[in-house]
């Protein structure tokens, strides 16, 4: 079982029942496109009157929308890689955003603090590492990924996974790899070698 936020799904063209959405996920909630990156198409909705506009913004990014309940707790991002024939969970990054959530401005324009390794208790860290690895293996990922979680007490709740995470100098996965003592070059060489052996 993978704990996660309560969610409501919409496909383009589906009827939009705002009351049913709020009955399911409550307020505030997050409305986001299912296939977009860098937090494009994501809105935090506080009032029912803002729901339709937020859904329209999300549909501009893709044909599927997910609406999720708001979880109030520590937000972390954690990379998992397959390296030297084993699945390795990287040091987690704690996200402290000045904005209402970790949006584009917070990610790329300095409106957040990224703390690696995250300030977690041993129990929280064990739960996070176990769950991040479980998500990675459940989805049968072969390369690398970065997953987002929010803690409710000691329990991390899975928010989303990115199987093509950013790899710039400011991106979280390279920061986590560096602390783990793995260079991007070494990771990619290992991936190429493993792929060639499979062929």
What are these regions (language model features)?
Residues 121-199:
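ATP-dependent carboxylate activation and anion-phosphoryl transfer catalytic cores
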Residues 1-73:
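Active-site nucleotide/adenylate-binding loops and adjacent lid/helix of ATP-dependent enzymes
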Residues 39, 113-116, 169-173:
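Short small-residue beta-strand/loop micro-motif enriched in glycine and branched aliphatics
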Residues 2, 59-64, 97, 137-141, ...:
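Generic secondary-structure signature for well-ordered alpha-helical cores
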Residues 10, 36, 95-98, 110, ...:
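Active-site/binding-pocket entry motifs
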Residues 46-127, 151, 157:
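Phosphate-binding site of ATP-dependent enzymes
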Residues 22, 52-59, 105, 129-136, ...:
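A generic alpha-helix structural signal
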């Amino acid at each position: 079982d993978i704990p996660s936020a309560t969610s409501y799904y919409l496909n383009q063209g589906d009827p939009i029942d705002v009351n049913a959405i709020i009955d399911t996920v409550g307020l505030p909630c997050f409305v986001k496109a299912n296939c977009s990156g860098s937090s494009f198409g994501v809105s935090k909705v506080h009032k029912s009157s803002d729901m339709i506009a937020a859904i329209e913004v999300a549909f501009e990014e893709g044909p599927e929308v997910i609406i999720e309940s708001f979880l109030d707790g520590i937000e972390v991002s954690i990379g998992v890689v397959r390296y030297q024939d084993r699945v390795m969970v990287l040091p987690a990054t704690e996200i402290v955003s000045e904005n209402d959530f970790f949006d584009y401005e917070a990610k790329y324009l300095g409106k957040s603090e990224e703390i690696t390794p995250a300030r977690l208790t041993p129990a929280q860290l064990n739960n996070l590492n176990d769950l991040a690895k479980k998500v990675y293996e459940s989805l049968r990922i072969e390369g690398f990924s970065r997953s987002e979680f929010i803690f409710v007490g000691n329990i991390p709740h899975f928010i989303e996974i990115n199987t093509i995470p950013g790899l710039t100098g400011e991106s979280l996965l390279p920061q986590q790899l560096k602390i783990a003592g793995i260079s991007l070059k070494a990771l990619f060489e290992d991936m190429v070698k493993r792929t060639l052996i499979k062929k």
